[in-house]
Amino acid sequence: MNILVINCGSSSLKFQLIDTDTEKVLANGICDRIGIEGSVLQYKNKEGKKSEKKEAMPNHTKAIEMVLEALTNKQNGAISSLDDIRAIGHRVVHGGEFFKESVLINDTVIAHIKECSDLAPLHNPANLMGIDVCKQKMPNTPMVAVFDTAFHQSMPPQAYTYGVPYEWYEKHKVRRYGFHGTSHKYVSQRTTEFLGLDYHNSKIIVCHLGNGSSISAIKNGKCVDTSMGLTPLEGLIMGTRCGDLDPAILEYISKREDLDIQSILNVLNKKSGVLGISGVSSDFRDLLDADLGGNERAKLARLAFAYRVMKYVGAYCAAMNGVDAVSFCAGVGENAKFIRGMIVKHLEFLGVELDEEANNICGQEAIISTANSKVKVCVIPTNEELVIARDTRAIVSQLKD
């Protein structure tokens, strides 16, 4: 069964066509700079042959048209016609309390996704655009929504409740939701497979470390806590996001810098994190170069990032009353061996010892703790698209033709 996976951003559209019988990727790519000058479609087929098409993409409609044309192209395409696509799986960032699992898309589902747009104003409207365009172009093809927030809906109330008036939750649904759920689900499951553990009788901490970063505690296959909150701004120090801070800072800075709330939130989302601390970059490769060159703020940014990760790992060990494995994933987690090393060396209290040689491995599955370590530490490259394809297949398989 061929599943087209769509991940629609505000100015980009990532896609993969996956044969779910073999779980092989038949084609993948990205439409970049949608609505901006310099639009481009980058495409790769199953043989790994790459192609690029520069053409104006004023909107997502044009982008999806170009994707469908590329997939059915006689020279470089993956399928002979659009009829070969059995279903479409859409990544949707925020499902609020409406969705605890992936669902078949219908008008009610679309209405609920719209209701959650205030909680994810940068993401949900873009996700909806992708759904709308696919509905126009392939009206008879079933579509499934897979939510970033769904995996975290198993958190108990004491984990997701904020210390604010309860009426805020009742009236406005102010609570912790968490994000990157599809990644946390895949990596936690894959970690137990990789280590030969029982997923439903295990305690796993997943560190999804990228430009956006989050940590989750997964006990017996259920998420019991996660670092991101109502929005993806809470938790770890990230590439450009501040993570946890004292809310009173907003009023304090508002008065002293003469900024309104929206301006401050823009700074906290786009100009903070390791970029804000270092003044150099949000990219950890640039930070490493600057640190090695003697830049003290770049060094501080890396230390602060690693320290926050360590704190959360320690807290989640307490939340689960122990841990079997800690796994790193996403761009930084999979490739930044120096950051991993900084974190793992502070987990000695768990009986963890870093295997320096194994830690040199980047971008592939590995155990980076020594054989004597009581808790295993792994690198597990994430595969959110595969989870979306699997969920889509499972739901569509239940439909009657």
Swiss-Prot record:
Enzyme Commission no: 2.7.2.1
Residues at which ATP binds: 14, 208-212, 283-285, 331-335
Disulfide bonds: none
Alphabetical UniProt keywords: ATP-binding, Cytoplasm, Kinase, Magnesium, Metal-binding, Nucleotide-binding, Transferase
Catalytic function, reaction form: acetate + ATP = acetyl phosphate + ADP
Source species, domain of life: Bacteria
One cellular component term from this protein's GO annotations in UniProt: cytoplasm
Residue(s) at site: Transition state stabilizer: 180, 241
Cellular location(s): Cytoplasm
EC class of the enzyme, as a word: transferase
MF-aspect GO terms: acetate kinase activity; ATP binding; magnesium ion binding
Residues that hold Mg(2+) according to the record: 7, 384
Residues the entry annotates as binding substrate: 91
Pathways per UniProt: Metabolic intermediate biosynthesis; acetyl-CoA biosynthesis; acetyl-CoA from acetate: step 1/2
GO biological process: acetate metabolic process; acetyl-CoA biosynthetic process
Cofactor needs: Mg(2+); Mn(2+)
Cofactor note: Mg(2+). Can also accept Mn(2+).
Pfam families membership: Acetate_kinase (PF00871)
Main subcellular location of this protein, as a coarse class: cytoplasm
Active site: 148
Family according to the record: Belongs to the acetokinase family.
PANTHER family: ACETATE KINASE (PTHR21060), ACETATE KINASE-RELATED (PTHR21060:SF15)
UniProt function note: Catalyzes the formation of acetyl phosphate from acetate and ATP. Can also catalyze the reverse reaction.
The protein's assembly and partners: Homodimer.
UniProt cross-references to NCBIfam families, sorted A to Z: ackA (TIGR00016)
Name of the protein in question: Acetate kinase
Lineage of origin: Bacteria, Pseudomonadati, Campylobacterota, Epsilonproteobacteria, Campylobacterales
